[in-house]
């Protein structure tokens, strides 16, 4: 049975205390709404998002990454509440999966399990450790009797710890029939989607409660909950990679992006941060190193190294306090304290301490190309654009602003000067 998916993302998110819309708050460097959309499009090609607060800003980000998303706008003034969000929604398929835009931890497998039940109305519920302000779910004889919003719950109902996760699967025809019947006769004067359970019950529809994991289905409302969710996501990411054979030393201190890939035997030390679409292949990343959108193969990086975007390392050693950006290094040693930006360096080359590729002239970036088996002495500056042929020696302290031919020794230093007894003359000793 095909499914249409609707994501509710129109709330103000006032508890987040931010100028940025709640669903654009980032979790592991990716907006919450993007985490949800990735899973939604894996399940259906008919995905809609309901927006209101800062609609244009949220819509722009959604369509940049998921251009096939249908965008709807909720009239919060006249139709507030979760049921009000569904006005104007026209599903293309036989049933609808309704998700919340602030639930980025939900796994695709859990949604598939929810969809596997053929009841006309499925409701995701969980046993809450602390029910707080969640809506309470009353279940009798394996069927949902009703959902009571916390604001409207009596003392007895507040004691119930079975809570509404806010995720529904409903037959499209049933939704179309029941939605117009929902009113706003409640304490908040809102149109609650939870009322659809009561209406379905009145028509003797079987409502199936599907129990899910509380942590996975947590809604994120403030910065504290955002931090809890990010920690939870990081634990899952690192657990997965450790099960694939990656060694993490003090994994709780490392950050691994959702799109990072490890291949072969890899080892990651403490306080490492690997971001973006980085690929680490048979490599060791040592303490306190940062890698952004780069490929590291058969290499060791760090400690305290920084690979900025678009670096490609193969069979290379990058030591402490070395920064690379847009650099291709093949069988290279750069042991310490260097900046290698916008460059290509070939096999057998050694980069001495304090080497800099001066790649920016204030207007444009320029490239440095260094060939094979080049020895670069300490404190060398390459003024790009410049090309160093194979088997060259660059003397320490040189500033290289011209191309250097194969096999040459390049020296560029100011003539030294020594003034005898100058100290004694200056201080009259």
Curated annotation (Swiss-Prot):
The active site is at residue 336. UDP-N-acetyl-alpha-D-glucosamine binds at residues 8-11, 22, 81-82, 135, 149, 164, 221, 308, 325, 339, 350. The lineage of its organism: Bacteria, Pseudomonadati, Campylobacterota, Epsilonproteobacteria, Campylobacterales. This is Bifunctional protein GlmU. GO terms for biological process: cell morphogenesis; cell wall organization; lipid A biosynthetic process; peptidoglycan biosynthetic process; regulation of cell shape; UDP-N-acetylglucosamine biosynthetic process. It comes from Campylobacter jejuni subsp. jejuni serotype O:6 (strain 81116 / NCTC 11828). Its main location: cytoplasm. Its cofactor is Mg(2+). Binds 1 Mg(2+) ion per subunit. Pathway: Nucleotide-sugar biosynthesis; UDP-N-acetyl-alpha-D-glucosamine biosynthesis; N-acetyl-alpha-D-glucosamine 1-phosphate from alpha-D-glucosamine 6-phosphate (route II): step 2/2; Nucleotide-sugar biosynthesis; UDP-N-acetyl-alpha-D-glucosamine biosynthesis; UDP-N-acetyl-alpha-D-glucosamine from N-acetyl-alpha-D-glucosamine 1-phosphate: step 1/1; Bacterial outer membrane biogenesis; LPS lipid A biosynthesis. Its EC number is 2.7.7.23, 2.3.1.157. Residues 1-223 are annotated as: Pyrophosphorylase. Keywords: Acyltransferase, Cell shape, Cell wall biogenesis/degradation, Cytoplasm, Magnesium, Metal-binding, Multifunctional enzyme, Nucleotidyltransferase, Peptidoglycan synthesis, Repeat, Transferase. It is an enzyme of class 2 (transferase). The keyword Ribosomal protein does not apply. Mg(2+) binds at residues 102, 221. Acetyl-CoA binds at residues 359-360, 378, 396, 413. Catalyzes the last two sequential reactions in the de novo biosynthetic pathway for UDP-N-acetylglucosamine (UDP-GlcNAc). The C-terminal domain catalyzes the transfer of acetyl group from acetyl coenzyme A to glucosamine-1-phosphate (GlcN-1-P) to produce N-acetylglucosamine-1-phosphate (GlcNAc-1-P), which is converted into UDP-GlcNAc by the transfer of uridine 5-monophosphate (from uridine 5-triphosphate), a reaction catalyzed by the N-terminal domain. Transmembrane segments: none annotated.
């Amino acid at each position: 049975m095909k499914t249409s998916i609707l994501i509710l993302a129109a709330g103000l998110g006032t508890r987040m205390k931010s100028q940025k819309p709640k669903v654009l708050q980032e979790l592991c460097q990716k907006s919450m709404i993007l985490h949800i959309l990735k899973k939604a499009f894996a399940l259906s090609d008919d995905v809609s998002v309901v927006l209101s607060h800062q609609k244009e800003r949220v819509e722009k980000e959604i369509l940049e990454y998921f251009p096939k998303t249908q965008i709807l706008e909720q009239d919060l003034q006249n139709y507030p509440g979760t049921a009000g969000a569904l006005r104007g929604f026209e599903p293309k398929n036989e049933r609808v999966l309704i998700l919340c835009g602030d639930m980025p931890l939900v796994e695709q497998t859990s949604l598939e399990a929810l969809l596997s039940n053929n009841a006309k109305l499925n409701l995701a519920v969980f046993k809450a450790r602390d029910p707080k302000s969640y809506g309470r779910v009353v279940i009798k004889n394996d069927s949902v009797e009703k959902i009571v919003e916390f604001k409207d719950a009596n003392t007895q109902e507040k004691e119930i710890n079975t809570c509404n996760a806010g995720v529904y699967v409903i037959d499209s025809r049933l939704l179309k029939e029941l939605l117009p019947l929902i009113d706003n006769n409640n304490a908040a004067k809102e149109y609650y989607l939870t009322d659809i359970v009561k209406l379905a019950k009145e028509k003797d529809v079987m409502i199936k409660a599907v129990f899910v994991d509380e942590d996975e289905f947590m809604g994120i409302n403030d910065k504290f909950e955002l931090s809890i969710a990010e920690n939870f996501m990081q634990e899952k990411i690192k657990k997965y990679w450790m099960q694939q054979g990656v060694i993490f030393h003090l994994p709780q201190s490392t950050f691994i992006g959702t799109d990072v890939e490890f291949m072969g035997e890899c080892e990651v030390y403490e306080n490492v941060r690997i971001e973006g679409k980085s690929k680490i292949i048979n490599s060791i990343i040592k303490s306190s190193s940062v890698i952004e959108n780069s490929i590291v193969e058969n290499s060791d990086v760090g400690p305290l190294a920084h690979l900025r975007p678009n670096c490609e390392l193969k069979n290379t050693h990058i030591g402490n306090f070395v920064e690379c950006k847009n650099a291709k290094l093949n069988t290279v040693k750069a042991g310490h304290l260097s900046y290698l930006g916008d460059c290509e360096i070939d096999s057998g080359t050694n980069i001495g301490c304090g080497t800099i590729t001066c790649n920016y002239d204030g207007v444009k970036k320029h490239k440095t190309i260094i060939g094979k088996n080049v020895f670069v002495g300490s404190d060398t500056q390459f003024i790009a654009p410049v090309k160093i042929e194979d088997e060259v020696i660059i003397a320490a302290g040189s500033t290289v602003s011209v191309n250097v031919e194969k096999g040459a020794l390049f020296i560029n230093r100011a003539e030294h000067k020594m003034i005898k007894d100058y100290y004694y003359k200056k201080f009259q000793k």
